[in-house]
């Protein structure tokens, strides 16, 4: 470690992204690494309409949830590096990732992008793209601002809430391609399924999905 790096560590100490504990190496402390709610076995993969498989490395609870809320709403964009690493490893271990042609993400509306300043799912997609060596492109667009899915009360409401919200980018070409769709959290899968439906209708041969975390059934 250089003198400059040592000074940086003193002024801006490295902290665990989940609990905030000051650590010397990595981005996660040993305690969190051991106790995080990892998905295992059949819990990793979900079957969703229009999606060949949706994989998630973590359950959305406790420290995982709190870290995600900081990432999404408190401008902790650097968290995308650690979250993206979890997601890329999950893809490597559970999907035929070498057959994936392009990575894309669930888009934000222009209104929400202006308010937040970044699309948390696209930052994750870019990180996964870099780790897997697969190109990342904006394939979809959000045509209108709908109610946040977290504010809906049922699976039926979630399906209705995303109907007609997304469409393909004008120059996007997915004909006979396999797409990896990136989102942050999956609950019922309504948003991912609707985006996958649009991609399949545009000619995509297969759509896989990966999220940072999932809710327990």
Model-derived features: where do they sit?
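Glycine-rich phosphate/pyrophosphate-handling loop used in enzymes and phosphotransfer proteins
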Residues: 1-183, 187-217
